[in-house]
């Protein structure tokens, strides 16, 4: 099984797949991604792969520099965004905004349908 390059909490999966969440704010340990990178994405809780994203940009930011547009790209309010970041990274000062777009996703139902249809072609 191929390892995931980045993980997201399961609660963000639907927003990513719907295109509502288009950035992720991370600490320095994930600042190495570059524009153009295609990342394999999994859920944090079980590391289950669910999509690929393309990195559009990576830029530094502080909590004080976060704006309403950042919150919108995270699909939440600004106060909620700051609270979530403080909860995940309580001792950090500088963060990295990873802007991304959805490239492709794994849909188990679609995959099963395609296998059934393909199987019918050969029988």
Curated annotation (Swiss-Prot):
* Protein keywords: Hydrolase
- Gene Ontology molecular functions: hydrolase activity, acting on carbon-nitrogen (but not peptide) bonds, in linear amidines; N4-acetylcytidine amidohydrolase activity
Instruction: Quote the catalytic residue positions.
Output: 21, 24, 74
UniProt-listed Enzyme Commission number(s): 3.5.1.135
Q: Do the record's keywords include Hydrolase?
A: yes
Spell out the GO cellular component terms annotated for this protein, sorted alphabetically and separated by semicolons: cytosol
Limits of the ASCH domain: 6-101
Q: InterPro entries, alphabetically?
A: AC4CH, ASCH_domain, PUA-like_sf
**Parts of the chain that traverse the membrane:** none
Q: Which residues form a coiled coil?
A: none
According to its UniProt record, this protein's enzyme class is hydrolase
Task: Fetch the Gene3D superfamilies from UniProt.
Answer: Hypothetical protein
Q: Name one Pfam family in it.
A: ASCH
Catalytic activity from the UniProt record: N(4)-acetylcytidine + H2O = cytidine + acetate + H(+); N(4)-acetyl-2'-deoxycytidine + H2O = 2'-deoxycytidine + acetate + H(+); N(4)-acetylcytosine + H2O = cytosine + acetate + H(+)
Job description of the protein: Catalyzes the hydrolysis of N(4)-acetylcytidine (ac4C).
What NCBIfam families would the database entry show? PRK04980.1 (NF003443)
Q: Which HAMAP family match?
A: ac4C_amidohydr (MF_00684)
* Family the entry assigns: Belongs to the N(4)-acetylcytidine amidohydrolase family.
Question: Which named protein is this?
Answer: N(4)-acetylcytidine amidohydrolase
Q: Tell me the lineage of the source organism.
A: Bacteria, Pseudomonadati, Pseudomonadota, Gammaproteobacteria, Pasteurellales
